[in-house]
Amino acid sequence: MKRGARGDLKRVDLKGCIRVKGKSYISIVMVFLLLGCTSYPAARKEASPPPSKEMGRAFVREALQHYQFVKDPDVVNLVNSVGRRIVSKVGANPDSYHFFVVRENQPNAFAIPGGYIFIFDGLLLQLRDEGELAGVLAHEIAHVERSHFFKDDKKIAALDIATIAAILLSGGNPAALTLAGAANLDIRLQFSRDNEAEADSYAMRYLEKGGFSSEGLLNFFDSLIRYERFNPQTVPAYASTHPGLEERRDRVANFLRKTSDTPDTGTGTGITRNWQRMQATLLSRNITLKDESTLLQAMMIEKMPEEKREEALNYLLGLAYMKAGRYSDAIPRYLTAIGLNENNHLYYADIAFCYLKQQDIDKSREAAIKSILLSRDYAPAHVIMGIIELDSDNLTKAISHLDDALKIDEANSMANFYLAMAYRKSSDAGKEAFYSARYFKLNLDPERALKELNRAKDLVTIDTPMHFRILQEIEEIKREGL
């Protein structure tokens, strides 16, 4: 759902990618608004959030007014999975971290206090595999965990959240800074070389603990160096205050050489199916027929085993066309992929969605059922069946399928959306409000989520599991900001 939309829930597209406003910058920046250490106490109703969380929440509120986010689960789930995997292994609380994917062409990522990490899709498109993504996120997590500061704490403390957000969102653009009233202030957001070096050092430790190859950070620097060489005009002025990418790259390479006698047991940097799905999703917004070869090159089809290339080629082109809303172009590609491999549940779930969008319900149902028979652990197929049953007023079956989807992936926004619709049809206003709230929360609209949760709280029976769950959701939004 696009931000700014108001009113009752209505059917929305499952693609979930939204355009972005504004500029950014190439350097990896870490935004800290505090003068103290970040802490993660156990959540209690009566406890106030730590100062880092309060400042982070304030920044997120401001960011939601300037950024627009990629919400497609094929993108968001992968970033969350990699990020939470690292956080869980370094002694931090994974529930205190939030990962955002911003729709912006510039390669960039940054962290703010309290565990809020932003990565731009322009950076995701420059990375080559999950190992490099892990390197990016490990570096930002290290900034949070090591409680790094701006160079001039007193000057930073004098800036308000809106000004800091304006500086970061301007991408160093002088005109934008002037309009934001932040001209000549971006110098206050410079980072120390020691902090950047320490973040790199800890990132390598975090990668090892998380089961990723330590070379992920090195490969990430190589990707940024390539981008910088081909796009020198996009590097903002204050990026020079950070250690140069090549200097940082050499330092990491030297460290890895010194420890080369220790076996690296982390995950390699192979291109996974999930990574290719993410890349196809991000590339789909501008796809045309003449772009097919470019898209396939970006997803490195040539590096796949030769016997798998034709299947992968048709599958990924079908996926890109589906994400672009070009269902008539997607279906023949999926049919070819299915002809080459009739046992892949993803192909059937995706083509079921295409048929659903074309209102070919019989074919959609058949393909969704086939996907579920091949794998009961893929939420989108259950969502499609839930939608079909809901449209036929088979509410019991619809709720069953949508519940199954949430058991697999509780963050599936469409399962929450259609459950709200199902409970509306069944006149269960309390559950309708609860699942509406979950939908709004997952779509980064915490204000509407809180409104629906408070409505749900007044509609359900007190001291029931649903009542306690509603209270828990309310507490979490107030504590985390979303």
Placement of each model-derived feature along the sequence:
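Canonical positions in the second alpha-helix
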Residues: 303, 337, 370-371, 404-405, ...
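Extracytoplasmic and endomembrane cell-envelope/extracellular-matrix remodeling and assembly machinery
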Residues: 42-47, 57, 69, 77, ...
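Helix-start (N-cap) detector for alpha-helical repeat units in TPR-like alpha-solenoids
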Residues: 311, 345-346, 379-380, 413-414, ...
